[in-house]
Amino acid sequence: MAYYLNSEAHLDPGPIYVRENGQLHMVNLALDGVKNSLQKPRPFRLFPKGFSVELCMNREDDTAQKEKTDHFIFTYTREGNLRYSAKSLFSLVLGFISDNVDHIDSLIGFPEQIAEKLFSAAEARQKFTEPGAGLRALQKFTEAYGSLVLCSLCLRNRYLVVAEKLEEIKSFRELTRLDLSCCWLGDEHELLEHLTNEALSSVTQLHLKDNCLSDAGIRKMTAPVRVMKRGLENLALLDLSCNPEITDAGIGYLFSFRKLNCLDISGTGLKDIKAVKDKLRANIGLVHSKVPLKEFDHSNCKTEGWADQIVLQWERVSVEAVRQRKDVEPRKAAQYFYQNRARTEVTRKCPLAETHMNSSGKLQFYREEAPDCHEPLLSQESKKSKKRAFKESEQEQSSPQSAKQKCVCLAVEDWDLLNSY
């Protein structure tokens, strides 16, 4: 401003005219230096030579800078010129809502096509990985769209994701396939209790391989089905392999799964395997398979739905958080220096393929197909004999002592467990 005021004194005002007695006179002619004033006036300059102007944008925040250019799409022509065009109003509104997706009140009744685009936009901005806000946003989608958000969830060997994103995992509804193999759940884990809720009554395939489960965990998981006929009543496939704490008594709790078609109890702590085979066949019609079943090769269970990439983002964030917290190199060097046994920190791998167990050692069961109604008379007679054998075994089991034990078991254990929910 000071420069501008000083520059005003050097500016040439040009010729000045005055009207007097009806005649127009030029004042400059009456002054000294008339010849100089009659010369061509110098061009008017607001700024001197060498003065440059810089257009300053808002540099306080990168987000603000992005918002100013977010309304345009920049492309290049064939000649190499930069060309920009304005985005559609739908894209602008979609981007704004996805940035504030955690503030949505409800999405119930909202069109699925638009909701999927909104979900993808929020996922691209990694809104579901934010603590707190991501959970609130995910709950709005799962409440409104259920299985469209996720119908199959595979968390095999992703115990870090289970530990860090437990509430997010519990928000999923109407899952049909759930793989929790090698997640170290144990009998008292919240997720094991969550399996009995109505939100997961649609689960038909459940993999709980190598989860440190025992008979108590199986009893807790099957209590709602056995007593109130709700929970995992639609379960058709169950994998309980590599849980050595499950004994013959725990297998008895599985008889409440009347729709069970495939069962894997390999690597459990069974004592009388022959008796378990007979009980499974007599109670729920499952037959021991002599060859490994393809249903348990863990190839069909995959994460499917809108949120399939979100699970990968959770895993990436969890691994990075653990790496930042761990600084084990100095400690390892000290352990080697003092000749102590260094603790090996390796990622625990899920024993999907047991090299020590051949096909004959696997305890996998399946349900036989229903026979044709026009079967031979001989097979019908053999069936009748089997039924008589089953009735005799049931009569032996229905002794007063066993009936009393069943009644006491239901009254003391099951009802106490159900009252804790």
UniProtKB/Swiss-Prot annotation:
Gene: Lrrc42
Name of this chain's protein: Leucine-rich repeat-containing protein 42
Region (Disordered) residue spans: 376-406
Pfam families noted in UniProt: LRR_6
LRR repeat coordinates: 149-170, 174-195, 202-222, 234-255, 259-280
Segments of skewed composition (Low complexity): 396-406
Family: Belongs to the LRRC42 family.
Keyword Cytoplasm: no
Organism the protein comes from: Mus musculus (Mouse)
Signal peptide residues on this chain, from the entry's feature table: none
Keywords (A to Z) from UniProt: Leucine-rich repeat, Phosphoprotein, Repeat
InterPro entries noted in UniProt: Leu-rich_rpt (IPR001611), LRR_dom_sf (IPR032675), LRRC42 (IPR039631)
Phylogenetic lineage: Eukaryota, Metazoa, Chordata, Craniata, Vertebrata
PTM-bearing positions, type Phosphoserine: 399
